[in-house]
From Swiss-Prot:
Start and end residues of each Thioredoxin domain: 85-208, 429-550
Domain of life assignment: Eukaryota
Matches recorded under NCBIfam families: ER_PDI_fam, pdi_dom
Region (Disordered), start-end ranges: 37-101, 555-597
Species this chain originates from: Arabidopsis thaliana (Mouse-ear cress)
Entry-linked InterPro entries: PDI_thioredoxin-like_dom, Prot_disulphide_isomerase, Thioredoxin-like_sf, Thioredoxin_CS, Thioredoxin_domain
Homology family: Belongs to the protein disulfide isomerase family.
Gene designation: PDIL1-4
Lineage: Eukaryota, Viridiplantae, Streptophyta, Embryophyta, Tracheophyta
Signal peptide region: 1-25
GO cellular component: endoplasmic reticulum; endoplasmic reticulum lumen; extracellular region; mitochondrion; nucleus; plant-type vacuole; plastid; secretory vesicle
Designated name of the protein: Protein disulfide isomerase-like 1-4
Assembly behavior: Interacts with MEE8 and MED37A.
Annotated glycosylation sites: 112, 213, 342, 524
Reactions this protein catalyses: Catalyzes the rearrangement of -S-S- bonds in proteins
Effect of deleting the gene: No visible phenotype, probably due to functional redundancy.
Length: 597
């Protein structure tokens, strides 16, 4: 304890001295720049522990492309909604491609891009990659939507972004698939679902009226048998205040079709009492709870709240098609039940009963653990293992968190868990590999359960690489990173570490891609870490650490620049008298690429 107090006192005095002595700090910076650092690159790779043991894994087979596996794994755009893409791992095995009739999907190349966009008022464009699993899953739905929307004068097109790089860069494609909707040459992001029905509904809302009139029984029958989610307003008049409120509400829901009628017989087909007081409204969907009646004030805000709360099934079954609907919903908290088919009957009944109390507040999701394509990979992502049903709460916002339920799957206990989840009374869960029994290599292994002990040790400056075993950029970085650690291993105040970001989590180690390299200065572990953005060389990293380390250090050039073979020949440490201000840091002009999550 006394040592920590003395250390913090010394660091405080040192920082104050540096702050009031800019010229002195500048001279220290010049000293770094003037150092002969060529010896740092002299260490041969053969002398670096682990240089010949790069991960043999070159693909993320459980999750095509690895992108699903960031905390926002079900979204599309890295800058807007996370990343529901396959960007970053083209080496993974592509899914088998079924026979798809794409006769109505226009193939766009750079040479015909302008013609397609300028000669058609409405164009939906998909940027894809041949190896992208999500693109392959989308293809049949996209093709079917193209055929249906052709009658409305809408063109659906696709662009192979791996061949048309300039187009992909021009439209800032950061993940696959990326869909853009062009109207008279102007584009905006597509934010709809991944099924034919949701694509068609989204596009029709953008090109037509928000509310359609239903005047005949034949038209009503077609709507009811379409399989789409439908809202029907039973109004006093097809124009006026009631219509205006319904139309305004329709603009807020891209995946629900809105209709209106004044015909009592049509209303009856939609399970509305023809003699009921107007305006009345009903939502019809194909799930188990098919009919939901509105009983509030007929104004936009109340209508939107009602539709948002009732359009999903009581319990949504997780599939690739339903993932966007679940995780891109305005409701950002979900309860996920992981269960096998043998366990599902009784458990799902309890789960559904609890769901009735949380409409519009929580989304209830069941995940089939027997499903090899998505059930088991999703369970692995969430850290679900072992036998028996598992229930977790998931907050799918910019700071995703997971909460594990510990108890018997009964509706009353699920309700208590759900209320505590809504009121932020639960402790989040973070994944962790087992703490290694031995951890004496130059690069220390960090896992979720020893993160605080190693990385958040206030007496140490700590460099952390968050990597993925399948990440090619991480594999390329490893020899240099090991070399850096070997050079710096005699500096007691500095720790070089790495953590597998696919199997370990910590709120202080948020990675938007792999590798992510973070620096945690001594004496300042409560602040956010510094993201290392510099050249991927030993010299560049050494300079970065010299500039940012709270506890100053300096390596002396060895008497001989031959590759050190023993611990005795490791460069000596020379402690300097001052530390440079972090404000003097300048970023390298060249940033290394990283594998997107």
């Amino acid at each position: 304890m006394a040592f920590r107090v003395l250390l913090l006192f010394s660091l405080t005095a040192l920082l104050i001295f540096s702050a009031v002595s800019p010229s002195f700090a500048a001279s220290s910076s010049d000293d770094v720049d003037d150092e002969d650092l060529s010896f740092l690159e002299d260490l041969k790779e053969d002398d670096v522990p682990g240089a010949d043991s790069l991960s043999s894994s070159t693909g993320f087979d459980e999750f095509e492309g690895g992108e699903e596996e960031d905390p926002d794994m079900y979204n599309d755009d890295d800058d807007e909604e996370g990343d529901f893409s396959d960007l970053g791992n083209p080496d993974s095995d592509p899914l088998p491609t079924p026979e798809i009739d794409e006769k109505d999907v226009v193939v766009i190349k750079e040479r015909n891009f302008t013609d397609v966009i300028e000669n058609n008022q409405y164009v939906l464009v998909e940027f894809y990659a041949p190896w992208c699993g999500h693109c392959q899953s989308l293809a049949p739905e996209y093709a079917a939507a193209a055929t249906e929307l052709k009658e409305d004068g809408v063109v659906l097109a696709k662009i192979d972004a791996t061949e048309e790089n300039e187009l992909a860069q021009e439209y800032r494609v950061q993940g696959f698939p990326t869909l853009l909707f062009f109207v008279d040459g102007e584009h905006k992001p597509y934010t709809g679902g991944r099924t034919k029905e949701t694509i068609v509904t989204w596009v029709k809302k953008k090109i037509g009226p928000g509310v359609y009139n239903l005047t005949t029984l034949d038209d009503a029958e077609k709507v009811l048998t379409s399989g789409n989610k439908v809202v029907l307003g039973y109004l006093n008049s097809l124009v006026g205040v009631e219509h205006d409120q319904l139309n305004a509400a329709s603009k807020a829901e891209d995946d629900v079709n809105f209709y209106q009628t004044v015909n009592p017989d049509v209303a009856k087909m939609f399970h509305l009492d023809p003699e009921s007081k107007r305006p009345a409204l009903v939502l019809v969907k194909k799930e188990e709870e098919k009919i939901s009646h509105f009983d509030g004030e007929f104004v936009k805000s109340a209508l939107v709240s009602f539709v948002s709360a009732n359009k999903l099934a009581l319990v949504s079954v997780f599939t690739r098609e339903t993932a966007p609907e679940i995780f891109e919903s305005a409701i950002k908290k979900q309860l996920l039940l992981f269960v096998t088919k043998n366990e599902s009957e009784k458990v799902l009944t309890e789960f559904q009963e609890a769901a009735k109390s949380f409409k519009g507040k929580l989304i209830f999701v069941s995940v089939d653990l027997d499903n090899e394509d998505y059930g088991k990979p999703v369970a692995e992502y969430f850290g679900v293992s072992g036998n028996g049903p598992k229930l977790i709460g998931y907050t799918g916002n910019e700071d995703p968190k997971k909460y594990f339920f510990d108890g018997e799957i009964q509706s009353d206990k699920i309700k208590i868990f759900g209320e505590d989840f809504l009121n932020d009374k639960l402790k989040p869960f973070y994944k962790s590999d087992p703490i290694p029994e031995k951890n004496d290599e130059d690069v220390k292994i960090v896992v979720g359960d020893n993160f605080d002990e190693i990385v958040l040790d206030d007496s140490k400056d700590v460099l952390l690489e968050v990597y993925a075993p399948w990440c090619g950029h991480c594999q390329a970085l490893e020899p240099m990173y090991n070399k850096l650690a070997k050079h710096l291993r005699s500096i007691d105040s500095l720790v070089i570490t790495k953590m597998d970001g696919t199997t370990n989590e910590h709120p202080k180690a948020k990675a938007e891609g792999f590798p992510t390299i973070l620096f945690f200065p001594a004496g300042n572990k409560t602040s956010e870490p510094i993201t290392v953005d510099t050249d991927r060389t030993v010299v560049a990293f050494y300079k970065f650490l010299r500039k940012h380390a709270t506890i100053p250090f300096k390596l002396e050039k060895p008497a001989s620049t031959e590759s050190p073979k023993t611990a005795e020949s490791t460069p000596k440490v020379e402690t300097t008298e001052t530390k440079e201000s972090p404000d003097s840091t300048t970023k390298s002009s060249q940033s290394d690429s990283k594998d997107e999550l």
